[in-house]
């Protein structure tokens, strides 16, 4: 009889169930969905889109409110070139979320994060570097890159 395990995906000598879910979008690939797939030995993706907002909603942090307050004067401005992400806040939100999810994994599957490179705004390289390395520092199993592979992505993670 053919079963799901008959179609195992082997990566680096380890078999995974051919269950692969997740991707882009703010918390569409929720931790609960990802953990269910990982528990079955599959490969799951979380999204790193708007993790400061996700952190605010899940953990009661105030990253989004702080950013809105800091740049309130630019709210109606056409030129938002002075608006930057607080990289310490980006790092803290990413580490908080990923660490929380990774503490609940079983080790049967993989938990990846999908990093949407085009989400960056001003100071894009610094923002991308912070997001990539914070996810790795928090223990994510791997990173997938979408919405445009940044040519510097691997260099940005070279110390990790």
Feature map (PLM): residue ranges:
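Active-site entrance/lid segments in N-terminal catalytic domains of soluble metabolic enzymes
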Residues: 1-160
């Amino acid at each position: 009889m053919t079963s799901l395990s008959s179609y195992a995906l082997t990566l680096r000598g380890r078999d995974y169930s051919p269950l692969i879910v997740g991707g882009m979008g703010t918390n569409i690939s929720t931790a609960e969905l990802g953990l269910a797939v990982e528990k079955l030995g599959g490969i799951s993706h979380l999204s790193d889109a708007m993790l400061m907002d996700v952190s605010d909603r899940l953990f009661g942090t105030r990253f989004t409110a702080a950013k809105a307050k800091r740049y309130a004067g630019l709210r109606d401005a056409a030129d938002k070139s002075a608006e930057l992400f607080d990289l310490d806040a980006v790092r803290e939100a990413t580490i908080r979320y990923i660490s929380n999810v990774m503490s609940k994994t079983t080790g049967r599957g993989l938990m990846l994060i999908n990093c949407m490179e085009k989400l960056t705004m001003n100071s894009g390289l610094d923002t991308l570097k912070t997001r990539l390395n914070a996810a790795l520092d928090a223990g994510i199993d791997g990173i997938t890159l979408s919405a445009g592979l940044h040519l510097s992505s691997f260099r940005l993670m070279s110390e990790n």
